[in-house]
Amino acid sequence: QVILNDKALQVMDNVPQFMIKNLQGRSCILDVKCTLGDGRIVNAEVQKSDNDDHQRRVRYNAALLTANIAEPGDRFKAIPNVVVVFISKFDMYKSGKALYHVDRIIRENGTMVDNGFSELYVNAEVQDDSDVAKLMDIFTRHDAYDDEMFPITSKRKRLFKTTEEGVNEMCEVIE
């Protein structure tokens, strides 16, 4: 809801470590694949290290995800919209923002065009007083267990970090 700026957002399903096989080349494992109430498919990727071309990674994952969700014979307008949210520890664009929206623009006239693909880059490095930066602080600050602005997120963090039940739940997800 915070990153996509949609208070009414509903996650209909959530699949961690979603494997996409590619018979023609490199396969990939998406960190998280979600289907939203409005039909959009979201891939959330989390990256700590800055050691690769992450924009190409986003493009590749989106292409495989789109190919994976398209049914044979589907018209292109029937393919669900795809959103990739790339969350990093570092400010990839080094412009001092916690959230970047990358849009498709016609260079010649500045018109924004929509092909059903959205990419958002979030980082935990920048504290710009936005809600996104405050949310990222919950994930990175060691003592963020009872935050008033994000009570559900901070309580889930407490569960995973400080209880046996949470550790067991995480182990099941990883397995």
Feature-to-residue mapping (PLM):
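Low-complexity, glycine/alanine/valine/leucine- and proline-rich hydrophobic stretches
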Residues: 106-115, 123-125, 135, 139-143
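Short hinge/gating elements
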Residues: 122-124, 170-171
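Accessory alpha/beta interaction modules
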Residues: 1-118, 128-130
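Active-site/binding-pocket entry motifs
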Residues: 127-128, 163
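Short, charged alpha-helical interaction segments and adjacent helix-coil junctions
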Residues: 35, 42-47, 133-175
